[in-house]
Amino acid sequence: MLFACALLALLGLATSCSFIVPRSEWRALPSECSSRLGHPVRYVVISHTAGSFCNSPDSCEQQARNVQHYHKNELGWCDVAYNFLIGEDGHVYEGRGWNIKGDHTGPIWNPMSIGITFMGNFMDRVPAKRALRAALNLLECGVSRGFLRSNYEVKGHRDVQSTLSPGDQLYQVIQSWEHYRE
């Protein structure tokens, strides 16, 4: 049985990751990033953009482009900072993806973590259930594909940097997740 599960995971059949919206679909600008992450990654850092929320594919694609534009054109980074962006439409938008180091949490955490951000401000409200479900599915996908350790740890952005991110309400939610560690 263990061999069958390992084979399914190796073939990518155990958990489908087809729910991830590729960069080409949300019309991302080309990335200029090249620093790669080593796998499997031990940490996942959850943040929020603290900006506008989105709840439809069109508005979330636009919001992902807005975040990328700000990071590339205003901050001068090589791409959108995050590995993945979560919309309240229930979709995961590919940022830098599983293989490229992000710019989401500073020089200590970026090389050893996947950065997942929820698009919107979650100080006073919880993200839609479908967005939370999408994030948990993404984490399962990462484990099944060997990008995340099976014993990965989820951290809130505020656990590793001085910030209010991921917002009070989202922070309260992620603290209940199985892999959350302060």
Swiss-Prot record:
Keyword field contains Phosphoprotein: no
A GO cellular component entry from the record: extracellular space
Chief localization: cytoplasm
Domain of life: Eukaryota
A GO MF label: peptidoglycan binding
Keywords: Antibiotic, Antimicrobial, Apoptosis, Cytokine, Cytoplasm, Disulfide bond, Immunity, Innate immunity, Secreted, Signal
Keyword Signal: yes
GO terms classed as biological process: antimicrobial humoral immune response mediated by antimicrobial peptide; apoptotic process; biological process involved in interaction with host; defense response to Gram-positive bacterium; detection of bacterium; innate immune response; killing of cells of another organism; negative regulation of inflammatory response
Tissue expression profile of the protein: Strongly expressed in spleen and lung. Also detected in brain and thymus. In the lung, expressed in the intraalveolar space, in the brain, expressed in the Purkinje cells of the cerebellum and in certain layers of neurons in the hippocampus. Also detected in cells filling the space within the intestinal villus.
Disulfide bonds: C17-C141, C33-C78, C54-C60
Signal peptide coordinates: 1-18
Protein location: Cytoplasm; Secreted
Ranges for domain N-acetylmuramoyl-L-alanine amidase: 39-167
Family: Belongs to the N-acetylmuramoyl-L-alanine amidase 2 family.
Oligomer status and interactors: Homodimer; disulfide-linked. Interacts with HSPA1A; this interaction forms a cytotoxic complex that is released by lymphokine-activated killer cells. Interacts with HSPBP1; this interaction blocks the cytotoxic activity of the PGLYRP1-HSPA1A complex.
Function: Innate immunity protein that plays several important functions in antimicrobial and antitumor defense systems. Acts as a pattern receptor that binds to murein peptidoglycans (PGN) of Gram-positive bacteria and thus provides bactericidal activity. Forms an equimolar complex with heat shock protein HSPA1A and induces programmed cell death through apoptosis and necroptosis in tumor cell lines by activating the TNFR1 receptor on the target cell membrane. In addition, acts in complex with the Ca(2+)-binding protein S100A4 as a chemoattractant able to induce lymphocyte movement.
Protein name: Peptidoglycan recognition protein 1
Name of the gene: Pglyrp1
